[in-house]
Amino acid sequence: PVCSSAASDVYKRQIVMIVAGPNARKDYHYNETEELFYQIEGSIVVKTQQDGKLVEVPINEGEMFLLPPKIPHSPVRSEGSIGLVIERKRTNNDKDGLMWFSDTANELLYEEYFHLTNIEKDFLPVFKRFYSDEKLRTCPKTGEVMEADSRYVSD
């Protein structure tokens, strides 16, 4: 009775995920809304791109971090880590994006924006496009080629 309908309404407007480590992704996610990270077990580092620089944000067990909107980010989760991530459900006008940066020069290699309806399905075609094209994975500054992720490359 007390705030139950209010809590239900808030839940309908949020995406709530429990995410376990380790992970092996090299992409950065762009979200036009805030994301709340709460680290339940272990620790993670959220790599962010801010003003052309790589900024790492450590989040230890029991800590929270509110990522501002429009900050490209790449959570690096260690073995055994468990975290809670809360995002706002997207409106029809919201765009998500995926970006990749070169390892040594931190140069943008590729970015693609889209309307996110299902995180499990919508990321996959972008991953496949990026990892299947060596030109997209080549740093314009150094010529370094990011290794293809075999999970997303067709034989």
Model-predicted segments: where are they?
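Double-stranded beta-helix
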Residues: E79-D155
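Short hydrophobic/aromatic-rich beta-strand segments that constitute the beta-sheet cores
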Residues: M17, V46-T48, V85
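Conserved metal-binding segment of the jelly-roll/cupin
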Residues: V19, P58-E79, R88
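Conserved short histidine dyad/triad with adjacent acidic residue
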Residues: V16-N31
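Short, charged/polar surface micro-motifs in flexible loops or helix N-caps
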Residues: K12-R13, P22-A24, S43-V45, K89-T91
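Single conserved hydrophobic/aromatic residue that forms the stacking wall/gate
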Residues: P1-A7, Y11
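Short, conserved, surface-exposed binding loops centered on an aromatic residue
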Residues: D9, H29-Y30, Y38, P58, ...
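A short beta-strand-loop-beta hairpin characteristic of the jelly-roll/cupin
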Residues: Y30-E61
